[in-house]
């Protein structure tokens, strides 16, 4: 599926999901301009993978994604502070869904994590559990929880959901240690 009208798609050199489009942009180093008819996180992903000589242009700067907007960099930093105060941050490996902002992806990398797509989420979680005891899955709680429970046999009680609108995410230090 795509989010552009057919009148726009007919002029596209490449179509696909966000990760494919970012990889395709990077595979064309001769392209001086990458005009990205998508949303912010998609253009940011392409910009991360392309060379400094390439300019990624997003024609509609108001094009956002509710999934990517589920967690802001500030909220994630606050969550990490809560994990630190609970004494578990050193056991946590962040895993972020491709549909997240460049700031969230940078946070994930800075803290030794990885970025996943819906098709490799299980492999990403398996890798993360090899690195640490706990996972902070961003920004989509459903993909993280469903993968852990349905595909990896974890219990729903093994997963807690941090709510950035509540003090300490609505979680106690004990809940964070037990998750």
Regions found by a protein language model. Name each.
Residues 2-179:
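The feature marks the mature, well-folded catalytic cores of soluble enzymes
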